[in-house]
């Protein structure tokens, strides 16, 4: 059995898992780093480090202490990555630092490979591989481009999940607002005008007097919103009721009906 086939099967274990749960980008980096014996970084289009893994023996303190903790590559470096429209293999590094051009690099014989991550005809990010002395072979590049495809599919899926989650949030808000009577709707508008941000303390009697409605109208409106899962409320006795917004599309939905 070929070495390439064995390595491909290791990557396939991620694909087999992705049918039931999201792929963790660090998992891809860990496996690819193991089979290719190199550093691996999955970078978003905006330069965010979605996942990474260092090969054994890699000791760049600048990268480990200044770049990785921020989970983001410098914009200048990310622009260079985005300039690569196709796979660039075995790029030799100069004597200067990859991320800080005016500083000298303490490592020699470093080679890197840059693989664009593309999905749905859109640039989604970049797969970056780096190691020392040993060049990446054609088999290595096959695995790298295959991995970039896996990552691209997962980024697209996570984007779709985000879109669906946003749509669900907005739909729940509209349903919750739709259950309110005219007086209850008037009450919640005043309630959330009183809040400082996404949570705060409400004294129902004060709002009732201010708006000219009964306290029960306010209580009913809050119960309906709590039943819909868009807010959380907790009675503090004489102090009032603490309200926390759980659905971050609620205020936006209320503004639209004004």
Curated annotation (Swiss-Prot):
Region (GAF domain): 1-156
General function of this protein: DNA-binding global transcriptional regulator which is involved in the adaptive response to starvation and acts by directly or indirectly controlling the expression of numerous genes in response to nutrient availability. During rapid exponential growth, CodY is highly active and represses genes whose products allow adaptation to nutrient depletion.
Protein name: Global transcriptional regulator CodY
Family: Belongs to the CodY family.
Lineage: Bacteria, Bacillati, Bacillota, Clostridia, Eubacteriales
Gene Ontology molecular-function annotations: DNA binding; DNA-binding transcription factor activity; GTP binding
Keywords: Cytoplasm, DNA-binding, Repressor, Transcription, Transcription regulation
Gene Ontology, cellular component aspect: cytoplasm
Pfam families the UniProt entry points to: CodY, HTH_CodY
Organism annotation: Clostridium acetobutylicum (strain ATCC 824 / DSM 792 / JCM 1419 / IAM 19013 / LMG 5710 / NBRC 13948 / NRRL B-527 / VKM B-1787 / 2291 / W)
PANTHER family listed in its UniProt record: GLOBAL TRANSCRIPTIONAL REGULATOR CODY, GTP-SENSING TRANSCRIPTIONAL PLEIOTROPIC REPRESSOR CODY
Chief location of this protein within or outside the cell: cytoplasm
Subcellular location: Cytoplasm
Biological process annotations from GO: negative regulation of DNA-templated transcription
DNA-binding region in chain numbering: 204-223
Superkingdom assignment: Bacteria
Gene3D superfamilies membership: 3.30.450.40, Winged helix-like DNA-binding domain superfamily/Winged helix DNA-binding domain
């Amino acid at each position: 059995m070929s070495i390439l086939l064995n390595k491909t099967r290791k990557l396939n274990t991620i694909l087999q898992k992705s049918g039931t749960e999201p792929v963790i980008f660090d998992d891809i980096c860990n496996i690819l780093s193991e089979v290719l014996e190199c550093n691996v970084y999955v970078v978003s289009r905006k330069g965010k480090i979605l996942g990474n893994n260092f090969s054994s023996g890699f000791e760049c303190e600048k990268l480990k202490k200044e770049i990785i903790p921020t989970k983001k590559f410098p914009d200048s470096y990310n622009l260079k990555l985005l300039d690569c429209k196709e796979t660039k293999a075995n790029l030799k590094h100069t004597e200067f630092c990859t991320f800080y051009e005016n500083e000298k690099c303490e490592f020699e014989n470093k080679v890197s490979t840059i693989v664009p991550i593309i999905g749905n005809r859109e640039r989604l990010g970049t797969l970056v591989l780096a190691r020392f002395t040993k060049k990446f072979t054609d088999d290595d590049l096959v695995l790298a481009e295959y991995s970039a495809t896996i990552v691209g599919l997962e980024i697209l899926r996570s984007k779709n999940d985000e879109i669906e989650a946003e749509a669900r949030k907005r739909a729940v808000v509209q349903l919750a607002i739709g259950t309110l009577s005219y007086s209850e709707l008037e009450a919640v508008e005043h309630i959330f005008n009183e809040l400082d941000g996404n949570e705060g303390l409400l004294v129902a009697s004060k709002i009732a007097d201010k708006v000219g409605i009964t306290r029960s109208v306010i209580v009913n409106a809050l119960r309906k919103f709590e039943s819909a899962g868009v807010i959380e409320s907790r009675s503090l006795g004489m102090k009032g009721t603490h309200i926390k917004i759980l659905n971050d599309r609620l205020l936006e939905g209320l503004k639209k009906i004004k």
